[in-house]
Amino acid sequence: MTLDEQIEDLLSQAPGFWHLDACGVTRSERQIPALLHGVDQPPAGERLQLVLIGGLSGRQEDADAALAALHSYRTAPGLSGRYALSAAPCANPDGLALGAAPENGAGGNPGTAYPPPGDSYYDANPEAHYLWRWVSFQAPDLVLEIRTGEATTWEGSALCLELLEQFRSVLNASELPSDSSLLGALSTGEPNLLPPVFGLRLTCAAADLDAELNKLWTVLGQVPDHARSPTRSALQARAARSPLDAARILAGVYGHELDPVIYTQGVAVSGRLRLAHLDAEYADPSDGIAAMVAPYMSGAEEWFPAGGEGGANLAGLVWADELAAATGDTRYADLLVQTADRYRATHDNGVPIPSNPNYQVEDMFFTAAVLGRAFKLTGDEAYLSILTRFLLDAKVQQADGLFWHDRRTPFYWGRGNGFAALSYAETLTYMPDDHPDRAAVLAIHRRHLQALRGYQHRSGMWRQVVNGPGSYPEMTVTCMVGYALARGLRRGWLDAGYTDMLTRAWQGVAARIDDHGGLVDVCTGTGVQQSTREYLDRPAIFGPDERGGALSLWFVTEMASFLQEN
């Protein structure tokens, strides 16, 4: 049987026991299969969380051993009531399918070179990047690696061997070396800026596997119920923070610069002003922001120098109406209205000059952000007319409800769909209830969110390629869709049926904001690409990032507003 057939056979033996997922995508665009057991991410229940890794070598016998271990776990009396086991049973599927073991057929070797260097996930060894991130964010209490070999050996991380004496006395486990293997690297230092994992590695002949696993299941029965790994505890602590807690962290890092004037910085400036409105303990940033933009206001610096006049730059003023309200200085509001007037001139096809004539989805947000606010400030219907004509003429939404990147680019980019969700939420925020185009705008928006509902991962996240299983869970699309959900629920154009979708998005994002404002997997700046492969290969930023920080801050403040009102 093929690997896929083996997995299907395993799943058919106990329907519903595991959920088939993908934890990565190889260079040949083959999914790295993952079997998920349990509901919450990070896990909130009482069961201890196990993660099994097999097939790193790309050899059939190693994948067979991992699948046999899954069967043994499922049929062991009482074990699944105390432990939830998820697995990547063949972590090197290209090596297996292409006969390239232990390499992956693209010049990489998923069994070595951990932690993987550089940004993710576009190099010759994407399996290593995907596995490195995936294992940690399963919040495992124990990671078990299984591989075949002539001699039987158990190896455990220092933390694991300290947890329970029986790992040594029953399994005769020696200490796992701190090497460049996946388990060795996960067991030391700060993998993914999280504490190290508890790790065990079993090497044995196939004929000895059942006996060795039965020893392990017996030992695991003696692990204390409260034995949570540091990794799981850290992720649960992130999940336990309130949106205001997360907002305070983000506001300490982002929104303190506006050079150049661009939405990736301007949204964060707006986020700081919103946080001050929500949190009496957060110092009013208005004076500091006014001082920051003073060189622009005086004319000493240009707002939009040559080459910096696109929609992304104009949307860098989304804070201006809020600063005008906070300070009473109407010059900021006037600036925003003057900027909105740039949208009055059009390309030959009627698209406003600051926007791409092919109706790129990012321009939907830039246009809505500027023109919606200009209408709010002036009451001039012309701004709404330009905006709604752009949205309704775009025809970028497809029959399934999702959005292409533009009219000529048939790919469901994650942040592209985030831009679309955010743009319609912003438009509906400023559009009067009796506006003749409101029903059409709202219908598109609801159909989009309903489509996105079907692609929300169990972690709460949406992926870099929305309909691409195994592409990485991406931070900005989740924040933008989360914002649209929270705004719609607050303002009443979405019903309570969307609340669970929002809650899950918040949980996913919360786990991916560290205590210093670092973020997990923010797609770098991305123009129109020519293939799914090119979207998969856009670098995923891990750590501080102004784009991700800005959109996260908007989402968490909107989430805080939703919770305060409900």
Language-model features, listed with the residues they occupy:
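Extended ligand-binding clefts on enzyme/binding-domain cores
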Residues: 361-362, 372-465, 471-482, 494-533, ...
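Short glycine- and acidic-rich boundary segments immediately preceding or forming the N-terminal edge
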Residues: 1-35
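Active-site-adjacent mobile loop/cap segments within catalytic or ligand-binding domains
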Residues: 155, 162-167, 176-228
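Alpha-solenoid repeat junctions
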Residues: 269, 276, 324, 375, ...
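Extended ligand-binding groove/face enriched in aromatic
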Residues: 298-408, 412
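Short beta-strand-to-loop junctions in surface cap/lid or active-site-entrance loops
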Residues: 34-46, 55
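CBM-like carbohydrate-recognition segments
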Residues: 182-186, 234-241, 246, 253-266, ...
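Active-site/substrate-binding loop(s) of hydrolase catalytic cores
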Residues: 27, 44-51, 60-177, 187
